[in-house]
Swiss-Prot record:
It comes from Leishmania major. Monomer. It is found in: Mitochondrion matrix; Nucleus; Cytoplasm. The keyword Transferase applies. Its EC number is 2.1.1.228. Belongs to the class I-like SAM-binding methyltransferase superfamily. TRM5/TYW2 family. This is tRNA (guanine(37)-N(1))-methyltransferase. PANTHER family: TRNA (GUANINE(37)-N1)-METHYLTRANSFERASE 2, TRNA METHYLTRANSFERASE. HAMAP family: TRM5 (MF_03152). Coiled coil: none annotated. Specifically methylates the N1 position of guanosine-37 in various cytoplasmic and mitochondrial tRNAs. Methylation is not dependent on the nature of the nucleoside 5' of the target nucleoside. This is the first step in the biosynthesis of wybutosine (yW), a modified base adjacent to the anticodon of tRNAs and required for accurate decoding. GO terms for biological process: tRNA N1-guanine methylation. It catalyses: guanosine(37) in tRNA + S-adenosyl-L-methionine = N(1)-methylguanosine(37) in tRNA + S-adenosyl-L-homocysteine + H(+).
Length: 686
């Protein structure tokens, strides 16, 4: 673990807060105000997809229209009467908010409306000069209508409301057209705004719905002109549209909306605060992997100067994230953990807009908090006994221990000390779903148990191994966390080859005492080897003795260099009953491939390291698990050991008169010769 020290981390964490001020802005929008409120269903249905959309911004507001007196000079007393649209909260604050919007003077409105009213039919409701009382305000998307497009004069549009118009089924269509045209001629309404109101009236009155906001060829919504002829009827729809048969009073007004960092998505914020245009090597961050409360990113060298800002943006946009870490080096350790820096940390004292935000603290016990299991407390106690133990390192360990839920199970993951990949959750589920109660699972590279724990919970007898002692310890923690029976999951901490040569061998050949766990299997034996960078190399334990090569023994961990890794599977004990050997044991081996023919290459990698050719009937399944890189895939080959292997093993039994490996030396040699042609993955891409 290469986490930053407390002092440097705290100092660098002060800088990112300034980015929030840099993204603050105010946007002027066109707003449609209407009453009565009972028309909301019909109007909002018509406006669906046309409203302003931004995170943390309400596009439909409850407002109160109240009269106020203008302080301007040169007007009559009557012309000084104006209207302000206040939200309830703003009304309580005496209208001091930036959101208080003033309407045009009454005299200006009456001048245009009186002309239209004189020619209206007796059945047409009287046109109001001002909206008063409770109203609804809908913020319109700028692609539909901009605030500067409300009136022909942009300066006037930014300061005043338009006149009040009557729309709907209770209003004669010719009257609507005349009042809109009069407002356009008087310079109180732009043609684009008039077109929009005409379209709203047609929809409210039940006219042709094709006279509406339509989509241009590029998919953007564009307002169309006033109707001149009847259009084709709308296509039938299964959705019931809300209807309103009364008159609706509407007006347009500009609305100032304050935007802060909460109004933007993570990708939008990063594109705003990072100088992407100034640096060609600086590209937008594609995303992150989340493991419990931890967000994991892989930053390039160009991103590193902005690591603290990136960490803060991730925290601000993801409430479930408390810690952000950056992968410093590639995975190179035999324990498969990687070095990381903490670039973002949400403290319990952090606040957003004055509100305290709950999160992790460096003194926390990670996400587990006070709910540690007995096995986890034991693991922590053992760590404290280490000669290299330090309180600061222990705090970091607790901070980076996450709780992950997957496949109906909970996993405690010490993320900085074990290997965990959340992108493999589907594969964990897929493989466990193949198993049935009564099966036995041998997980050679088990990690903290993403295969082992759900399989044991399903009723499968599990023998799980990992070379990493921390992973082995946390398998026990996760067994306790998921309330597994004591005999359901057996944990081992040894080299994978030793596990194959001991635990698996005694179970498959029934060489152990019948009373030992794993000897009896009423279902099928499964062997998982999920270490795609080098898992196929562990298959050398099954090679015939004649094909043993130096690299196999050189790569063996925690074993004598002089030992022959495949000796156990080439010498069958005399007391073993050949008929009791389980030849149906199914191996699931993972590897990487960059070849054009992924399936052929994956099988070839297995054959090269196994030392035997796999007949088609022994290959049960070969599939691509996921994309690792543009030209690199993770593969899984599920197979049983071929007849040639079992024939060689039986020939090695004392008293059979055979020489192990002799009958198949030619096949094995041929495979070993082409080993260099097999696609090998680099260990740092595990």
């Amino acid at each position: 673990m290469s986490a930053k020290q407390d002092g440097s981390t705290a100092e660098s964490r002060k800088a990112p807060h300034s980015y929030r001020e840099r993204v603050n802005s105010t946007v002027e929008l066109a707003a449609l105000v209407y009453r009565p409120l009972t028309a909301s269903g019909a109007l909002l249905s018509i406006l669906r997809g046309k409203l302003y959309r931004r995170r943390s911004v309400r596009n439909v507001l409850d407002v109160v229209a109240v009269r106020s007196i203008s302080g301007g000079q040169g007007h009559s007393a009557e012309s000084k009467v104006r209207v302000e649209y206040l939200t309830p909260a703003e009304g309580n604050a005496n209208g001091n908010s930036i959101s208080n919007i003033s309407a045009a003077p009454c005299a200006d409105i009456r001048g245009s409306s009186d002309t239209a009213a004189t020619s209206s039919s007796p059945s047409t409701p009287a046109q109001p000069t001002l909206l008063e009382g409770r109203c609804k305000m809908c913020l319109l998307d700028p692609t539909v209508l901009k605030a500067t497009e409300l009136c022909p004069d942009p300066a006037s549009a930014a300061q005043h409301c338009t006149p009040v118009f009557l729309l709907g089924a209770a209003v004669v269509g010719s009257h609507v057209t005349r009042q809109l045209e009069a407002a356009v001629q008087a310079g109180q309404l732009s043609r684009k705004a008039a077109d929009l109101l005409q379209q709203l009236h047609e929809r409210l009155a039940g006219g042709p719905s094709s006279v509406s906001l339509t989509e241009d060829t590029d998919g953007s919504e564009q307002p169309q002109g006033l109707p001149r002829a009847a259009a084709a009827p709308p296509p039938p729809s299964n959705k019931r549209r809300a209807s309103y048969t009364g008159a609706v009073e509407v007006t347009f007004t500009p609305r100032a909306v304050e935007l802060n960092y909460q109004a933007y998505t993570m990708s939008e914020l990063l594109s705003m605060v990072l100088p992407l245009r100034e640096h060609a090597d600086l590209v937008a961050l594609s995303g992150f992997e989340q493991v419990g409360h931890i967000a994991h990113v892989n930053l390039s060298a160009a991103h590193l100067p902005y690591a603290d800002i990136i960490g803060q943006v991730i925290l601000d946009c993801n409430e479930t994230v408390s810690v952000v870490v950056n992968k410093v080096d590639a995975i190179s350790s035999v324990f498969r953990e990687f070095k990381m820096d903490i670039i973002g940390l949400r403290r319990r004292t952090d606040s957003v807009d004055g509100n305290v935000v709950a999160g992790a603290d460096l003194d926390d016990a990670g996400e587990a908090g006070g709910s540690l299991t007995a096995a986890e407390r034991q693991a922590i106690a053992l760590e404290a006994l280490s000669p290299t133990y330090s309180l600061a390192e222990a705090r970091v360990h607790r901070l980076l221990t996450a709780t992950v839920r997957q496949h109906g199970c909970s996993f405690r993951v010490p993320y900085n000390r074990v290997y965990w990949n959340s992108r493999l959750s589907f594969e964990h589920t897929r493989l466990v779903d193949r198993m049935r109660p009564g099966d036995v699972l041998f997980d050679v590279m088990a990690g903290v148990g993403p295969f082992a724990v759900p399989a044991a919970k399903k009723g499968v007898q599990v023998f799980a191994n990992d070379l990493n002692p921390v992973a082995a310890q946390y398998m026990k923690v996760n067994a306790e966390l998921n309330h597994l029976p004591a005999n359901a999951l057996h944990v081992f901490n040894m080299d994978g080859r030793d596990f194959l040569n001991s635990v698996l061998f005694t179970s498959v050949t029934r060489a152990a005492d019948a009373s030992l766990p794993g000897h009896l299997c009423t279902g099928r034996r499964h062997v998982t080897m999920n270490l795609p960078a080098i898992a196929v190399e562990f298959l050398d334990v099954f090679q015939p003795l004649s094909s043993t090569c130096a690299p196999a023994s050189e790569q063996r961990c925690n074993a004598s260099a002089a030992a022959v890794v495949n000796e156990r599977w080439n010498h069958l004990p005399a007391h073993v009953d050949p008929n009791a050997i389980d030849r149906r044991t199914l191996f699931h081996v993972y590897c990487f491939s960059a070849a054009e023919d992924l399936i052929t290459d994956a099988v070839r990698q297995v054959e090269v390291n196994l030392g035997y050719t796999l007949p088609p009937e022994n290959i049960e399944e070969t599939l691509m698990v996921r994309d690792v890189a543009p030209t690199k895939r993770m593969m899984c080959v599920s197979f049983t050991l071929p007849p040639a292997f079992w024939k060689n093993l039986l020939a090695s039994r004392p008293g059979q008169g055979g020489e192990p490996g002799g009958a198949h030396a030619e096949t094995a040699s041929t495979l070993v010769e082409v080993e260099q042609a097999a696609k090998k993955a680099r260990p740092d891409k595990m």
